[in-house]
UniProtKB/Swiss-Prot annotation:
The keyword Heme does not apply. SUPFAM superfamilies: Translation proteins SH3-like domain. HAMAP family: Ribosomal_uL24_B (MF_01326_B). Part of the 50S ribosomal subunit. GO terms for cellular component: ribonucleoprotein complex; ribosome. One of its GO terms (molecular function) is rRNA binding. This is Large ribosomal subunit protein uL24. It comes from the Bacteria. GO terms for biological process: translation. Signal peptide: none annotated.
Length: 118
């Protein structure tokens, strides 16, 4: 995949089936098996920010005189292919399918359970 530069428009944003507020499960990497809520999606980078997942410590220098430096722990984005939407009712992760409802609106549902997401 080519480098993505949002300002120059060299690549389009990637269509993502995961949205802010969804509960997801990590399927690969150091946090495999953990679940969390999506705080933010980054469609130009195909990444998601998940609460409590992929936490890293960052050393912050003092910005003003008289202030001390500190160590912050915060979440960093992970690739969208490393997460799957998680059903809290059935306790299972599943792929998402988009279908057109009887009234003509697009809906998302889990392939394994058939549970509607929205």
């Amino acid at each position: 995949m080519a480098a993505i530069n949002k300002t120059k428009g060299s690549a389009d944003r990637i269509k993502m089936k995961i949205r802010k507020g969804d509960t997801v499960q990590v399927i690969s990497g150091k946090d495999k098996g953990k679940t969390g809520e999506v705080l933010k999606t980054l469609p130009y980078e195909n990444r998601v920010l998940v609460q409590g997942i992929n936490q890293r410590t960052k050393h912050v220098k003092p910005s003003q005189e008289g202030e001390t430096g500190r160590i912050e722990t915060k979440e960093f984005p992970l690739h969208a292919s490393n997460v799957m939407i998680y059903s809290t009712k059935e306790k299972v992760a599943s792929k998402v399918e988009i279908f057109v409802d009887k009234d003509g609106s697009k809906k998302r549902r889990l392939k394994k359970t058939g549970e509607l997401i929205d």
